[in-house]
Curated annotation (Swiss-Prot):
It comes from the Eukaryota. InterPro entries: TB2_DP1_HVA22. This is Protein YOP1. The lineage of its organism: Eukaryota, Fungi, Dikarya, Ascomycota, Pezizomycotina. The chain crosses the membrane at residues 36-55, 57-76, 87-103, 106-124. Residues 56, 104-105 are lumenal. GO terms for cellular component: endoplasmic reticulum membrane; Golgi membrane.
C-alpha cells in the first residue's frame, strides 16, 4: 500500500508532465526556480482561498465561468467537429440563464460561502468531463422551452406561397 506522500508525488509528477507542454510554464520554472506543478497548485489554492473568503469572489467566479468556457468555445469554433460546438452553445445558454436568475434573486446576502458554491457549480457546468450544462439543459430548460422552439412548419408558413399561387390563378 502506498503512502499518501507517494501518491501526492505521483500526482505532482503527472501534473508536471502535463504542464511541460506549455512553454510559458517551462520559462517560469527556469526563471524562478519553482517547479511548475507547485506554482500551478499554489495559484489554484490561492484562487480558491480568495473565493472562499470572498476577496473578489464575484469577479473570480465570473472569470472562471467565462475564461475556461471561452477558451474551449473558441477551440470548438476552429475545429471541424460540430459536436463540441453544440456542447459549448448549450453551456452559454445555461450560463446566461443562471446569470439572469442570479441577478434577479439576491442570494448572495443570505447564502454563506455563495461564491465558493457558485465556483464549483460553474466548474461542473463547464468542464467537458462532467457536461453539467448538458444535464441542466436536458433536465430543466429543454422541457420548459422546447414548446416555444418547435421546428415543424406552422400553418402560416405556406401562406405567402398560397397567396402567390392564388394570384396567378386569377
Amino acid at each position: 500500500m502506498s503512502s499518501p506522500q507517494d501518491r501526492a508525488q505521483y500526482y505532482i509528477g503527472q501534473l508536471d508532465r502535463e504542464l511541460s507542454k506549455y512553454p510559458a510554464l517551462n520559462n517560469l520554472e527556469r526563471t524562478t526556480g519553482v517547479p511548475k506543478a507547485y506554482a500551478v497548485v499554489g495559484v489554484v489554492v490561492l484562487y480558491f482561498f480568495l473565493i472562499v473568503f470572498n476577496l473578489g469572489g464575484q469577479l473570480l467566479t465570473n472569470i472562471a465561468g467565462f475564461g475556461i468556457p471561452a477558451y474551449y468555445s473558441l477551440d470548438a469554433l476552429f475545429s471541424a467537429n460540430k459536436e463540441d460546438d453544440t456542447q459549448w452553445l448549450t453551456y452559454w445558454v445555461v450560463f446566461a440563464m443562471f446569470t439572469v436568475v442570479e441577478s434577479l434573486v439576491s442570494v448572495v446576502y443570505w447564502f454563506p460561502f455563495y461564491y465558493m458554491f457558485k465556483f464549483v457549480f460553474l466548474l461542473w457546468l463547464s468542464l467537458p468531463a462532467f457536461k453539467g450544462a448538458d444535464i441542466i439543459f436536458r433536465s430543466f430548460l429543454a422541457p420548459t422551452l422546447s414548446r416555444y422552439f418547435v421546428h415543424s412548419r406552422p400553418a402560416s408558413s405556406n401562406l405567402r406561397a398560397k397567396a402567390d399561387s392564388a394570384g396567378k390563378a386569377e
